């Protein structure tokens, strides 16, 4: 079965979700981050907790470091953290606080050589988050266009010892309408790096389709807060 990494997005140490990455659509989740971690830890298919510091993604510097460290102590599950990570110093600060993996976004898109350097220093522990509206990459909290094509960029980093590529189709994010199956499958076929699907995943059926498409992991946000998503999963 495909692995599930439930997403916890933080603003002011509160678990929230956005729609299409729009900060104006912020809504608090029904469970606190602490309650969510306890709930997710019950399921064998959950192999990691995915945490994003949303304000850091905009302001380009981490703000929730100490709170995330508290969350790490609540479970045996490993954590990966993203949002505003632009320096090796920040990466190592997270590692020192017990975070197993970090997610690089904007900095890695804008500077692929830097991304390769940190991946070589910490092989398998760095993930690149490629956030695109369909296949056009956006950065800085999904607020800025880059003019970069998803597939052209991935070819630049394909040889780096990354943990994987987290692909989010922004047009699907937070809508519970299903991910972009076609483009995600195309991406998985175009790279030797593991592909992690994110954005719009709503059901066990979506997970099964992604697994058939060659996707290694699904990151699930809004749907993971509903009991119905977990029916039939162990």
UniProtKB/Swiss-Prot annotation:
Signal peptide: none
Keyword hit for Hydrolase: no
EC class: isomerase
Active site: 9, 131
InterPro entries hit by this protein: Aldolase_TIM, His_biosynth, HisA_bact_arch, Isoase_HisA-like, Isoase_HisA-like_bact, RibuloseP-bd_barrel
The EC number(s) this enzyme carries: 5.3.1.16
A GO biological process held by the record: L-tryptophan biosynthetic process
Keywords assigned: Amino-acid biosynthesis, Cytoplasm, Histidine biosynthesis, Isomerase
Biochemical pathway: Amino-acid biosynthesis; L-histidine biosynthesis; L-histidine from 5-phospho-alpha-D-ribose 1-diphosphate: step 4/9
One CC-aspect GO term: cytoplasm
Keyword Metal-binding: no
Broad class of the protein's primary localization: cytoplasm
Superkingdom per UniProt: Bacteria
Listed Pfam families: His_biosynth
One annotated GO molecular function: 1-(5-phosphoribosyl)-5-[(5-phosphoribosylamino)methylideneamino]imidazole-4-carboxamide isomerase activity
Catalysed transformations (reactions): 1-(5-phospho-beta-D-ribosyl)-5-[(5-phospho-beta-D-ribosylamino)methylideneamino]imidazole-4-carboxamide = 5-[(5-phospho-1-deoxy-D-ribulos-1-ylimino)methylamino]-1-(5-phospho-beta-D-ribosyl)imidazole-4-carboxamide
Subcellular location: Cytoplasm
HAMAP family in UniProt: HisA
Recorded family membership: Belongs to the HisA/HisF family.
Protein name stated in the entry: 1-(5-phosphoribosyl)-5-[(5-phosphoribosylamino)methylideneamino] imidazole-4-carboxamide isomerase
Species this protein is from: Staphylococcus carnosus (strain TM300)
Lineage: Bacteria, Bacillati, Bacillota, Bacilli, Bacillales
């Amino acid at each position: 079965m495909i692995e599930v990494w439930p997403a916890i997005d933080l603003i002011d140490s509160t678990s929230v979700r956005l729609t299409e990455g729009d900060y104006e659509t912020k809504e608090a989740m029904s469970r606190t981050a602490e309650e969510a971690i306890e709930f997710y830890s019950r399921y064998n298919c959950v192999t990691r907790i995915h945490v994003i510091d949303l304000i850091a993604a905009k302001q380009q510097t981490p703000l929730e470091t100490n709170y995330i460290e508290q969350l790490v102590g609540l479970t045996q599950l490993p954590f990966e953290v993203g949002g505003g990570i632009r320096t090796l110093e920040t990466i190592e600060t997270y590692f020192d606080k017990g975070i197993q993996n970090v997610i690089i976004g904007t900095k890695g898109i804008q500077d692929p050589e830097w991304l390769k350097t940190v991946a070589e220093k910490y092989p398998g522990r760095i993930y690149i988050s490629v956030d695109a509206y369909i296949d056009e990459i956006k950065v800085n909290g999904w607020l800025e266009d880059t003019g970069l094509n998803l597939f052209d960029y991935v070819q630049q980093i394909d040889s780096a010892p990354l943990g994987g590529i987290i692909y989010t189709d922004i047009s699907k994010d937070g809508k519970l309408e299903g991910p972009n199956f076609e483009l995600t499958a195309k991406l998985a076929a175009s790279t030797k790096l593991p592909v992690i699907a994110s954005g719009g995943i709503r059901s066990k059926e979506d997970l099964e389709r992604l697994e058939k498409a060659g996707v290694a992991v699904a990151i699930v946000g809004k749907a993971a807060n509903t009991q119905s998503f977990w029916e039939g999963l162990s």
